[in-house]
Structures are given as structure tokens and as C-alpha cells.
């Protein structure tokens, strides 16, 4: 492909791109070996293209994308070639992070880097309790059209009783068990105090990408949950 690009009067080879995110196996040693093999291949391709003068311009772009193994690809973004190299990480989930799959995967990154609390989740979806049809079950006004569900179900985080204002953490036994198009099933111990119709439930997401694509704009709030701004999405 690189040779054909170099021969083309309409194309220019600007760099080498890869995506390591599909290699995630949630096993540190396996992940490290898989990413090393990929990046060794990427470096070899870049060096071969450089030796054959396939790159156009004075700067070569080396880029990898993914929000789980980004720390493992960085060394492979700086191959030893004649031209100047610009390494670019295309990780996107760091913008909002999450309370689910990336929260778990980040723990491995933090262990490898020797840090903690490096990213904080910043995206929540709030829903109202619409019905309590039976003990231990509440139906929320939030579903597959509103929140991500492809990797994990949302996580119940906060509870604000009707008219009270302040939020509180939900009891640890509260779980989302299923989603319909427009409803979420919140389960809790039937013999305990549960939410009532009109209460608000704050949900944490798992996988920011498939929540962003459901909203054309998002309110921005301060620490007291007052809306202070808004952002539009183009996902």
C-alpha cells in the first residue's frame, strides 16, 4: 500500500496508524505482549517506509488510538528514522471517563505507571422513577436510547428523593438489571427502603462513546449540580 501511495500523483504518505484497543484482554502480561508485538510491527513498517523514501514531507505522523492501553503504545510512536516524528495518541474516553469498563481498565494503567486517581468520571445520566410495580423493583425513565449498554449496564450512583434536593449515594445493593428502549430496571432488596415515584436516580455510564452518540448537547454542571454551561456533541 505504501509503495502504491508513493507512486500516486494524488496521494501522499504522511505516517503510520494503528489501533490497539481490540487487543485488550484484561490480563496485564497478555496485554503487554500483544501491544509490544503490534508496535514492533508498526515501527518496522515505519522504518521500511523511511528507508524507501515513501514518506512525503519532513514530518512523519505515528498514531495509535484506544483508551485502555495507551501507556503501552507510546514507545512505539517514536521510531528511529531520518525524518522528524510526531507521535499522537487518539484516545478519546479520557475526556469523560466512566464508572464501568474504562474505570476498571484504568486501574491496570495506574499500576503500570505508579499513580492513582488519574482520571475521574465526569458523565452521568439522571432519570426519574416512573413506576414501582412490585417490591424490590423501580422503573426509571432512561433506556437504550439514552445511555450506553454495549459493554456493561449503567451503574446506580446517586439518589435524590422528590423535593429534597441534595443527592446521596445509593445503597450498595441497588443494581440495574436490564434496559428497554426507554426504561431501566432498578432492583433493590424488597424488604428495605427503596425509591419512590418521582425520585431521581443518578446513573454512571460504562463506555462514553455510546452515550455521547445519543445526545446532541450536554449540560455542564458545577459541584452543586447547577447548570453553568452546555456543550454540543458531534460523534
Kindly give the residue locations of the regions a language model identified.
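C-terminal accessory subdomain/extension
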Residues: 133-235
Amino acid at each position: 500500500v505504501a509503495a502504491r501511495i508513493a507512486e500516486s500523483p494524488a496521494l501522499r504518505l504522511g505516517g503510520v496508524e494503528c489501533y490497539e484497543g481490540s487487543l485488550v484482554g484484561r490480563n496485564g502480561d497478555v496485554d503487554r505482549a500483544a501491544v509490544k508485538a503490534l508496535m514492533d510491527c508498526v515501527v518496522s513498517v515505519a522504518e521500511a517506509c523511511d528507508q524507501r523514501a515513501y514518506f512525503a514531507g519532513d514530518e512523519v505522523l505515528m498514531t495509535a488510538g484506544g483508551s485502555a492501553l495507551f501507556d503501552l503504545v507510546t514507545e512505539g510512536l517514536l521510531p528511529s528514522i531520518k525524518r522528524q516524528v510526531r507521535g499522537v495518541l487518539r484516545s478519546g474516553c479520557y475526556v469523560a471517563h466512566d464508572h464501568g469498563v474504562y474505570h476498571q481498565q484504568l486501574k491496570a494503567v495506574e499500576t503500570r505507571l505508579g499513580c492513582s486517581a488519574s482520571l475521574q468520571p465526569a458523565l452521568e445520566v439522571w432519570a426519574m422513577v416512573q413506576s414501582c410495580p412490585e417490591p424490590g423493583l423501580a422503573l426509571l425513565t432512561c433506556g437504550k436510547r439514552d445511555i450506553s449498554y454495549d459493554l456493561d449496564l449503567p451503574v446506580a450512583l446517586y439518589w435524590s428523593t422528590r423535593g429534597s434536593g441534595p443527592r446521596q449515594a445509593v445503597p450498595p445493593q441497588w443494581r440495574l438489571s436490564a434496559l428497554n428502549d426507554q426504561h431501566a430496571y432498578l432492583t433493590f432488596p424488597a424488604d428495605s427502603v427503596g425509591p419512590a415515584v418521582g425520585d431521581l436516580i443518578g446513573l454512571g455510564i460504562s463506555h462514553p462513546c455510546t452515550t455521547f452518540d445519543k445526545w446532541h448537547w450536554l449540560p455542564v454542571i458545577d459541584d452543586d449540580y447547577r447548570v453553568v454551561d452546555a456543550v454540543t456533541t458531534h460523534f
